Amino acid sequence: MKYFYAFLVLFLVFSCSPEKKGDPLRFKFGTFEIPASDNYGKTVIIRKDSLQIEQYTKKVSISTDSLVTEKETTKIDTLYIKWKNNFAYSLRMKNPKTDLDKDPIFVQITKVTDTSYSFTARIGYSNFKQKGTVYKVK
């Protein structure tokens, strides 16, 4: 009977361990995707060490006197990524082209699933916030 209680206690202890389903560490390295939005095409993100490389297409309107056309251009940005903790990181452009590019981007992870995370991002110290979802590809 003594062994039965010991087994029961051990079983309860190990069966109540927290589930690692929402572990955010898997989002620190790898290839990710942000789906297309109104002005941007799909963004592909590659994270290695302290670098994040983003490739995306941007829609640009070109207007002449009588005609307005849209053109998609492919852009690649390289950013430094610094993790504050498992749910917050900041991004800084490696080669900023404008004053706005010099401001850091603060990202807060708000929800984690098996294959994605939702985030809220803020550029610099402004009140403007952008929300989105990042999907892990590999």
Where does each model-flagged region fall?
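Positively charged n-region of N-terminal signal peptides that target proteins for export
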Residues: 1-4
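N-terminal glycine/threonine-rich, aromatic-flanked beta-hairpin/loop signature
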Residues: 42-84, 125
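C-terminal motif of bacterial Sec signal peptides marking the signal peptidase cleavage site
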Residues: 13-15
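Short, exposed beta-strand-loop hairpins at the edges of beta-sheets
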Residues: 118-131
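An anionic, turn-rich surface loop/hairpin at beta-sheet edges
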Residues: 91-112
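Bacterial signal peptide processing site
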Residues: 17-19
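Tryptophan-anchored aromatic micro-motifs
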Residues: 24-42
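Hydrophobic/aromatic beta-strand elements that line small-molecule binding cavities or substrate pockets
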Residues: 43-46, 77-82, 104-111, 132-136
